[in-house]
């Protein structure tokens, strides 16, 4: 039976790779709704190729431009824009699965709307669970909605848990490549430029997540995401640097068994599994050749050089609104770094200072989380202006 899917963030890295998976399985997958940000030219081509019923762009002017160009192609989907447009795509009646491939906390509201519409969630937008993990997981439980992880590490953990008793878990071993600056000293890190940071050694990703990988904040966000996806305490989630990115994560059980998920560093594999689950579909992607591996190495992350990882653990353990502040401040700091406004090593400093200014709240509802998100962005921007 063909699965009807909506994609939030179709012009981003994960969105484009999701469409590549769709192209490989034309009998199994069909796109019924698409949403994107500002890349209207690429979005136009996607609309022409997939002919969705409902589409949305960030700005009204881009939506009007899109409508004009689609009419020329004799295509007349429903066209929306802004946050209302994201929610419309997330709740599209025909869709069974919603791929949340947006970058940042902007994914929170449409993801919650999709859950309330009883859509299955293929989650690539980790910031949703970072900012509002307790709220979102309770909402999913209330509406009996499955959240299927798309992140390679969480997909790996999920697969290592199949058929196992969660109470038998001793530790989750979350692997990290270590990023492009794993071997740089503190002084060298001070001189890192955006161009240097955007060259990830193993993965093809968007700009924001690539910078997060370089600071190890991405791994910190994944720790918080893992806590909510799998119900494991922070003390039982361990990060290990694995530069080859062959083992995508591991689950250690109480009897001493360690189950690992191995594969090529290709995001299309976990995307495909989230869309095919509970089945596995054959594909023509490059396969891992064990005899070609020169070795698998592991090391402890250096939180002195990369303090973002420790900040994420601290915020996660505080709970409540702390992870939302962490996430929002980090988004602002990363964008400031990409714009040349701050140095690489100022990113964690700005996040820490924003966290220190916040009065934490426990068990916030969605409206409170969104309010705190806005406050944290303003506070981080204020700190940046005074740098």
Curated annotation (Swiss-Prot):
One of its GO terms (biological process) is isopentenyl diphosphate biosynthetic process, methylerythritol 4-phosphate pathway involved in terpenoid biosynthetic process. Its cofactor is Mg(2+); Mn(2+). Mn(2+) binds at residues 151, 153, 222. Keywords: Isoprene biosynthesis, Manganese, Metal-binding, NADP, Oxidoreductase. It comes from the Bacteria. 1-deoxy-D-xylulose 5-phosphate binds at residues 126, 152-153, 177, 200, 213, 218-219, 222. It catalyses: 2-C-methyl-D-erythritol 4-phosphate + NADP(+) = 1-deoxy-D-xylulose 5-phosphate + NADPH + H(+). InterPro entries: DXP_reductoisomerase (IPR003821), DXP_reductoisomerase_C (IPR013644), DXP_reductoisomerase_N (IPR013512), DXPR_C (IPR026877), DXPR_C_sf (IPR036169), NAD(P)-bd_dom_sf (IPR036291). Transmembrane segments: none annotated. It is an enzyme of class 1 (oxidoreductase). PANTHER family: 1-DEOXY-D-XYLULOSE 5-PHOSPHATE REDUCTOISOMERASE, 1-DEOXY-D-XYLULOSE 5-PHOSPHATE REDUCTOISOMERASE, CHLOROPLASTIC. Belongs to the DXR family. This is 1-deoxy-D-xylulose 5-phosphate reductoisomerase. It comes from Desulforamulus reducens (strain ATCC BAA-1160 / DSM 100696 / MI-1) (Desulfotomaculum reducens). The lineage of its organism: Bacteria, Bacillati, Bacillota, Clostridia, Eubacteriales. The gene is dxr.
